[in-house]
Amino acid sequence: LHKDYECFYMQNPPQAIEWLSRGNMPDLIISDIRMPEMRGDEFLAYLKLNELFKQIPVVMLSSEDSTSERIRLLEEGAEDYIVKPFNPQELKIRIKKILD
């Protein structure tokens, strides 16, 4: 992804929230569901309830191929749900479709 996009990596959602609160506005957020300190679905809810960040598309990553979890997260505002492990080319295609 680094060849096509400027990427910033955060260790956990609180670190990402701090980065966003400093005025950084990404075109897209990719978030794992299982993370330390705050779950990905909680991070998604925070973003979608915040006027400044609710328009940022969020792609959720999970090692679980759960239809019910996928549907729930898409209904809660995720732009896409990708199951790990995934093909990097597929991820690039999905990102391009979201950003175009």
Residue ranges and their predicted role:
Residues M35:
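Receiver (REC) domain active-site loop signature in two-component systems and cognate sites
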Residues E64-D65:
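Short, conserved "switch-loop" micro-motifs in signal-transduction and mechanochemical regulators
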Residues F86-I95:
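C-terminal output helix
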Residues Y9-L28:
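Acidic, metal-coordinating helix/loop segments flanking the phosphotransfer/catalytic sites
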Residues L1-F8, L49:
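Two-component/phosphorelay signaling modules centered on CheY-like receiver
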